[in-house]
Amino acid sequence: MRRILALVLCLGLLVFPVRGSESEKYVALTFDDGPSGRFTRRLLEGLDQRGVKATFLLCGYRLKDYKDTGRAIYEAGHEIGLHGYSHDNMGKMSYREVVNEIADTMALLPEGCKPVFLRPPGGASSEALSQAAKNAGLALLNWSVDPKDWAIHDAAAVETAVVDTVQDGDVILLHDMCESSVDAALAIVDRLLGQGFRFVTVSELAAIKGVVPQPGQMYCKFR
């Protein structure tokens, strides 16, 4: 009888795979505007020490000057997405201008890198932008938690703003362009790990939540 019960249980596990406890909490850290050289390198080191993967939305004009850092992001196992080439408002661009922004940035990505997401600077949107992203096979990505680290330059305040509001499935917006942002990011990781959160890339978060990102569609969080 015990052998029969064990066999039934094993078959049940094969037929109904476990995706993880419903009590598990997942979030995605995202970093805009880079790469930035020493700040990005310090961030990569800190994330590696904590076993955390993130998603970096890179600008083409920055990649042009920091190709080695872009390669380091990719080789460390982080996800790379696009943030346009010029960091100009893509919501005000023509279809052809958006296409060029995407193509010029794609040409600078590390070999083998196949991005899933495009984050328009400022979270901009337009029909031309959506169509260009769709035709390039890119989903659009915004965010659900924004502590405005780029403006306040106060690591403790940024940390508090995120920790006090973050929920399972959130996409956190940060930057890797200054010391205070890196300090805040690593402090946030430490605090949320202590609260039982698990950090994953945006693509991983979507998969965990059963979402298949569609080209041209905008996503802010995954519940």
Segments predicted by a language model, with ranges:
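Active-site beta->alpha N-cap acidic-glycine motif
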Residues: 18-108, 114-115, 187, 207
